[in-house]
Amino acid sequence: MVLYGLKSCDSCRKALKALPQATFVDLRAQGVPGAVLQAALDRFGAALVNTRSTTWRGLGAEERARPPLDLIAAHPALMKRPLIEEAGALYLGWGPETRAALGLA
């Protein structure tokens, strides 16, 4: 199990605490492999970009119009977190649906 996130993200910290066996990958330091990021975009679409973040609010209209993968490559904090990869399946966020799917409900 791999958890992609940020050390400073509350949701990521909660997920790591509940999933001590997960390998943590820092989005800023290491990034997300291109194939995983593309699979996440295919699975979650526009929801992959966190439009409620301060990073998003600081972007101009021209920058916001860029493709999601380009935006995330330029601004890793724009990706909704955590992104969890488990046995080929991807989960986004740390809501009740993700916890239930991982058997933690």
What is each PLM-predicted segment?
Residues M1-Q30:
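Local sequence-structure signature of Cys/Sec-based thiol-disulfide redox active-site neighborhoods
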